[in-house]
Structures are given as C-alpha cells and as structure tokens.
Amino acid sequence: MIREERLLKVILAPHISEKSTVNAEKHNTVVFRVAIDATKAEIKAAVAKLFEVEVESVRTLVSKGKTKRTGGRVGRRSDWKKAYVTLAAGADIDFVGGAE
C-alpha cells in the first residue's frame, strides 16, 4: 500500500499540448507531469485515488532538459517525467470544467 502523502506528491500537473488533446479525444488518455522518481504503480494509484477513475494502463517517459544560454553562461534545464494514463472506457477527467 502506498502512503497518501506520497500519492499527493507523485502528480505535479496535467500536461496540456496539441498531442495530449488528440490523445484524450481518440484514445481516452490523459497526460501528466509526474515526479522524476515516480513508478507506474504509484502513478496509477495516485490517479485512481485523486480523480476517482479506473486506470487501464500507464506509460512513462523521461524528457531530457534542454541546454540554454543566457549571455555568456550555459545552463541546463532539469529533466522531467511524463506519464500517459489510459482511462477505462466511460471514465473522464475534466480539467477545465467550472462549477456546475
């Protein structure tokens, strides 16, 4: 069993992009930015508990940080992890819905 404090720290934010919107419409898949050390089991449990939906599968990838320059200095952005969460048929997560 994963502790509730950990589940709250796993999901950082929804990742909204053109690709994630198409995936949501066609494949019932939602994309999240997650903690770099999060496992698929933790992500699945966190989404199921926080959004009260049934999760079918989780796919993850680590996006490498870009090298950026500011003046003469060279720096690097942090690596971050993205999770594609496929929801069960009929399940839906509404991020932009207001009060009804």
Curated annotation (Swiss-Prot):
GO biological process terms held by the UniProt record: translation
Alphabetical list of SUPFAM superfamilies matching this protein: Ribosomal proteins S24e, L23 and L15e
Gene3D superfamilies per record: 3.30.70.330
InterPro entries listed in its UniProt record: Nucleotide-bd_a/b_plait_sf, Ribosomal_uL23-like, Ribosomal_uL23/eL15/eS24_sf, Ribosomal_uL23_CS
A GO term from the CC aspect: ribosome
Keywords associated with the record: Ribonucleoprotein, Ribosomal protein, RNA-binding, rRNA-binding
GO MF, any single term: rRNA binding
Protein role: One of the early assembly proteins it binds 23S rRNA. One of the proteins that surrounds the polypeptide exit tunnel on the outside of the ribosome. Forms the main docking site for trigger factor binding to the ribosome.
Subunit structure: Part of the 50S ribosomal subunit. Contacts protein L29, and trigger factor when it is bound to the ribosome.
Similarity annotation: Belongs to the universal ribosomal protein uL23 family.
The protein, known as: Large ribosomal subunit protein uL23
Species: Shewanella sp. (strain MR-4)
Organism taxonomic ancestry: Bacteria, Pseudomonadati, Pseudomonadota, Gammaproteobacteria, Alteromonadales
